[in-house]
């Protein structure tokens, strides 16, 4: 026989010189389907062994899909599924009549006599269904590549295909059943023991800021944390500080516990990776960003810059600055990072720049889809997800500028899905814009008030699903965009 080859014009697999198409049949095992259905009809208890992973659409034959679904409906009502009860439910169905349903059910019962382990048959049916879905995805990928317009980039098609493949690979794996309380207690005790052994008693990923850690106990796996603030409050700067601290603290913890080093992922939808790394360099080397942009540096500053650049280059810190990503693209890329680089924590700057998948005209619905997607990523990958968010302009219309939960844009869904909501607020920013004239009697009082809030940023924990809320004042060095502990005015030293 001649070797297989592809006909380029028709994309049909051929196995001879005449390019005759090879008839290919979708993978299935009709006999296994018949034997399993017969066994379940003989003993309804067997349904419990396969129903957790096997659904009606996993069957290849349409009549078998209908029979399995009917069995599920009957047993859900507390009744016994038998050929007689099935016949009364399906008697008006055209397909059931076409296969002479009564006789066919009797045939299934007869075939069940040869069934030894029904679970094996269920797994065979499930596995073949996955393979058929894999074929469908492959065909869709090919068709989309042939028929795509210039508006759809190849990279977007790859991510779409990757997402479908990942969902297929994960099918059935994320469906958790009841867990015995003893197992949950063991997991809780293990977390408590880890906290007791840690000198800082932090269970989650340390923020590198003592007072904030005392309030939050670090960032916890599967949590969605929203960090919100008005422009110029320092949202991105604070997020960069948290990300760098997390990267260093995870590394130390991983080394101590002899674990694989975890990485930080940072989706920067607004700033370029170069702008973000320039901020990091400014922060770590303590060189103002203007000097870095203009290149006006003395030898001492330049040597300091090179040293910090070398240190940062060794970190497991990954930046994706692709603009206008969809929530599905973020999920796909986060999964890839988890697989390739052991992603430990994810930052997104910022929420309102993410595109929804459904392209709803209702922005509140779209934000709801996005926040639910981010929470799903946190749970699926078992990592903390920190998403930055804008606040509405209503803050600027009030005398008291301190933000509240109602100030969140599309606040209902964000507040609902988040485990923690934090606001960043700098009273110094607003006071400097209200300076009275130098000779004014109010100037002295204004100056006294300004001195009290100088270089202070308040982190307002407005929602904390598993802990206390309240205000955490931090030291803020505006020149280098560094956040530290207020009492000691020190920064994370890792």
Curated annotation (Swiss-Prot):
One of its GO terms (cellular component) is primosome complex. It is an enzyme of class 5 (isomerase). ATP binds at residues 229-236. This is Replicative DNA helicase DnaB. Its EC number is 5.6.2.3. Transmembrane segments: none annotated. Gene3D superfamilies: DNAb Helicase, Chain A, P-loop containing nucleotide triphosphate hydrolases. PROSITE patterns: SF4_HELICASE. One of its GO terms (biological process) is DNA replication, synthesis of primer. Residues 198-490 form the SF4 helicase domain. The keyword Lipid metabolism does not apply. Pfam families: DnaB, DnaB_C. It comes from Rickettsia conorii (strain ATCC VR-613 / Malish 7). GO terms for molecular function: ATP binding; ATP hydrolysis activity; DNA binding; DNA helicase activity. The main replicative DNA helicase, it participates in initiation and elongation during chromosome replication. Travels ahead of the DNA replisome, separating dsDNA into templates for DNA synthesis. A processive ATP-dependent 5'-3' DNA helicase it has DNA-dependent ATPase activity.
């Amino acid at each position: 026989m001649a070797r297989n080859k592809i006909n380029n014009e028709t994309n049909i697999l051929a196995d001879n010189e005449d390019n005759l198409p090879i008839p290919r049949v979708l993978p299935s095992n009709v006999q296994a389907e018949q034997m399993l259905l017969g066994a379940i009809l003989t003993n309804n208890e067997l349904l419990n062994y396969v129903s957790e992973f096997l659904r009606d659409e996993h069957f290849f034959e349409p009549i078998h899909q209908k029979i399995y679904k009917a069995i599920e409906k009957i047993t859900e009502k507390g009744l016994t599924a038998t050929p007689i009860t099935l016949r009364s439910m399906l008697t008006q169905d055209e397909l059931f009549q076409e296969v002479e349903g009564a006789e066919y059910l009797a045939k299934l019962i007869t075939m069940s006599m040869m069934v030894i382990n029904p679970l094996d048959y269920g797994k065979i049916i499930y596995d073949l269904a996955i393979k058929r879905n894999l074929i469908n995805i492959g065909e869709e990928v090919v068709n989309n590549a042939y028929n795509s317009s210039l508006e759809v980039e190849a990279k977007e098609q790859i991510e779409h295909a990757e997402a479908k493949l990942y969902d297929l690979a994960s099918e059935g794996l994320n469906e958790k059943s009841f867990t015995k309380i003893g197992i949950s207690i063991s997991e809780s005790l293990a977390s408590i023991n880890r906290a007791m052994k840690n000198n800082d008693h932090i269970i989650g990923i340390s923020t590198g800021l003592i007072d904030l850690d005392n309030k939050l106990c670090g960032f916890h796996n599967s949590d969605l944390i929203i960090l919100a603030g008005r422009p110029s409050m320092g949202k991105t700067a604070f997020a960069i500080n948290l990300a760098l601290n997390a990267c260093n603290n995870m590394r130390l913890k991983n080394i101590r516990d002899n674990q694989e080093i975890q990485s930080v992922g940072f989706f920067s939808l607004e700033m370029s990776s170069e702008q973000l790394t320039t901020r990091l360099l400014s922060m770590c080397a303590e060189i103002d960003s203007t000097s870095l942009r203009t290149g006006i540096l003395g030898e001492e500053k330049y040597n300091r810059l090179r040293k910090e650049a070398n240190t940062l280059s060794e970190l497991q810190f990954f930046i994706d600055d692709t603009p206008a990503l969809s929530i599905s693209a973020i999920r796909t890329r986060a999964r890839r990072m988890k697989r390739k680089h052991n992603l430990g924590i994810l930052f997104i700057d910022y929420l309102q720049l993410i595109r929804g998948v459904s392209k709803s005209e209702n922005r509140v619905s779209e934000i709801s889809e996005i926040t639910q997607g981010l929470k799903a990523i946190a749970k699926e990958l078992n990592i903390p997800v920190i998403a930055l968010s804008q606040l509405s302009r209503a803050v600027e219309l009030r005398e008291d500028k301190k933000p509240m939960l109602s100030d969140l844009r599309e606040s209902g869904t964000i507040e609902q899905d988040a485990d923690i909501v934090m606001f960043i607020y700098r009273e110094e920013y607003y006071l400097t814009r209200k300076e009275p004239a130098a000779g004014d009697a109010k100037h002295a009082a204004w100056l006294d008030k300004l001195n009290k809030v100088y270089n202070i940023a308040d982190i307002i924990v407005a929602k904390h699903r598993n802990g206390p809320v309240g205000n955490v004042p931090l030291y803020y060095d505006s020149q280098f965009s560094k956040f530290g502990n207020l009492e000691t005015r020190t920064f994370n030293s890792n």
